[in-house]
Amino acid sequence: MVSLEQYLLQSLNMALGSLIQGETSYTNSFNIKIREDGFIFVPRLPCSYILDDELYNEIFLIANASLYPQYTLLKQNATYFIPLNGNDIHVQRGLFFPWRKGISERLVVSDLEEFTRTLGEDSIPIMKNLKINLNKLNHMAICGNSGSGKSYALTYFLSVLKQLSELIIVDPKFDTPSRWARENDISVIHPMENRSKSDFVSEINEKLSQALHIIQKRQAILYENPRYQFDHLTIVIDEVLALSEGVNKAIKEAFFALLFQIALLGRATRVHLLLVSQRFDHTTIPVSVREQLNVLIQIGNINKKTTQFLFPDLDPEGIVIPIGHGTGLIQIIDNEHPYQVLPLLCPTYYTKKGIL
């Protein structure tokens, strides 16, 4: 049986071709080293090819397809050089390609209510081999075009967060989140036919202002006792884009200012934002708020255009996106997960009638 190292070396020898001027491992031009967390492409310098982003991406495309489904290569935004041990200057550096063992697998939940009751403390399962620790969560965004499965994914997160956090829910569409909240006896801020949109956003601003006041009180407690553990508070806003368009300028600016302050100050005080929108450009939320998000989910059609706001530096070419409803990309920026973007399959679950 061919070893993984030999298999990968053969794949690169056959596919790189003209990009490296016909040089191969057979002419001792490069080699491969396998590590637990990835593999290293070791060029023997000087060489006739350039070690640049084009070569790095080409190796990624070849290796990612070759290693699937045993490994998932993690896409880098730029060439990843690492130093190698040894005194021979010809082979003292390599191009590193990090990976995760296996592929993304969808979590299937037969009874959502029972499932959420048995969850571990502060744990949010995303896929079979991926969980988020709520204590490491700053703020979260779910993005996707209409019909991509955002509401279905949001209902799952609401059901899980109900067990772990106090919830404030804003539902501009008066749709799925409102029905879920009705079934779970949680109040929702939603539009009413006898009120203007500016009045509706003003009510939201009032609620955000109360949350900011909670943050300030908690900061004072942390000043005296830095180890104090607060209960989580999560502010869930569905269709943020619907709130930021077509409202009075002063009210919109107040909304953005409150979002920014909560995003900036909420982390240490366990006050989180969960924002859902069809897009996250500067007209939806301020860029300064987007920069505070550390769990980013893009569902639906994945290309450079759809990922430009949540993942501005990412070229999704070569990433194996699963087929089906509720699939896309996820990035978790903390000290427990690889910071690179991963293929995502949102959980499939069964819940009470009349919510979805």
Q: Whereabouts are the PLM-identified features?
A:
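Conserved P-loop NTPase motor module
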Residues: M1-A15, G22, Y26-P43, Q292-I297, ...
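Hydrophobic, Leu/Ile/Phe/Ala-enriched alpha-helical segments that form helix-helix packing faces
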Residues: L8-E23, I59-Y71, F157-L161, A211, ...
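P-loop NTPase catalytic phosphate-binding loop
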Residues: I40-L45, F96-A220, L241-N301, C346-I355
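Short acidic, glycine/proline-enriched loop segments that cap or flank alpha-helices
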Residues: C47-E54, E224-Y228, D281-T284
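Interdomain "pre-motor" coupling segment immediately N-terminal to P-loop NTPase/helicase cores
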Residues: C47-L107
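Conserved ATP-driven motor cores of ASCE-family P-loop NTPases powering translocation/secretion/packaging/pilus
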Residues: F60-L61, S277-G354
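Structural motif
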Residues: A141, H232-I237
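Short helix/loop segment immediately N-terminal to the Walker
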Residues: Q219-T234
